[in-house]
Curated annotation (Swiss-Prot):
Fe cation 2 binds at residues 118, 185, 219, 222. Pfam families: Ribonuc_red_sm (PF00268). This is Ribonucleoside-diphosphate reductase subunit beta. GO terms for molecular function: metal ion binding; ribonucleoside-diphosphate reductase activity, thioredoxin disulfide as acceptor. Tetramer of two alpha and two beta subunits. Belongs to the ribonucleoside diphosphate reductase small chain family. Coiled coil: none annotated. The lineage of its organism: Bacteria, Bacillati, Bacillota, Bacilli, Bacillales. Provides the precursors necessary for DNA synthesis. Catalyzes the biosynthesis of deoxyribonucleotides from the corresponding ribonucleotides. It comes from Halalkalibacterium halodurans (strain ATCC BAA-125 / DSM 18197 / FERM 7344 / JCM 9153 / C-125). Its EC number is 1.17.4.1. GO terms for biological process: deoxyribonucleotide biosynthetic process.
Amino acid sequence: MEQLQKRKIYDTTASNASTGILNGKSSNVLNWDDVRFSWAYPLYKNMLANFWTPFEINMSHDAKQFPTLTETEQEAFKKIIGLLAFLDSVQTDYSMRAAEYLTDSSLAALMSVLSFQEVVHNQSYSYVLSSLVPKATQDEIFEYWKHDDVLKERNEFIIDGYEKFVDNPTPKTFLESIVYDVILEGLNFYSGFAFFYNLARNQKMVSTSTMINYINRDEQLHVYLFTNIFKELLVEFPELNTEETKTFVKTTLMKAADLEKDWFRYIIGDKIPGINPEDMETYISFIANKRAVQLGMEKPYPEIKHNPMKWIRAYEDVNSGKSDFFEQKSRQYAKVSADNGFDEL
């Protein structure tokens, strides 16, 4: 299959609107009133509307509360933060590499916003940890991914998929790398998100959970971007719209769900009150189905039709317009005058 060519800095012979997502022609001048995809500009506006920084969230209450968590809750908290930090670090790099081959300036611009948001997510984990634990513990948490065997297996599954594209950039490997991206942003975070939301509904670590919700909100838009690109590529490269691709998506999502369930059993299992292991595993399958539908593919678990963890919907519904479900003043946080709000300790 043809190799992908990186986007030119500019091309005076091409129109502003691109002729293709990959290996197309475009001037590379971005005019939002002259772009190929009608969904690109509304998505750009939504991504900008989500703008936030960790500094807006006061961590002083969480800092007081963290030592009162059970040992199991503290251990899960730290390991899940360590996982999220790894995933968002990798995601920042992958999105920038993928953007180099996008020959549509509007999609490249969206990818730039996405990459920036991933940097903010990653920094938010440092912000949380610096509020709660000593520097030495923080450093240890950021090394978990190197030494934890369960975590390594889970991470290597994603990285292997990304590296196939990086080492051999073709339309096929690019398309397949999107599936791994959707898994990373749209599946691998979700048992971890559920842990923090479960703490929040028990009035524990509310500020951290609010930050997680902001990240959740961003990731939903990131998944929307990548699934749209995936479906557009199947139109642009009909030779990739095959049974082989459908099988690849299904088997890859199922393998990812199995690894996610293994991680959940290892890190949470039946050790955290309020999280039912059977419900969580069904929930992971439910989310895998949701991502398959967004990719325009068949559900890998057709027998799973409903979300068994109905309580979590309030935490994931980031556009409901309801008052802050964490019972904080509002989601428009006043700026904290001292780092992490420690002037209030």
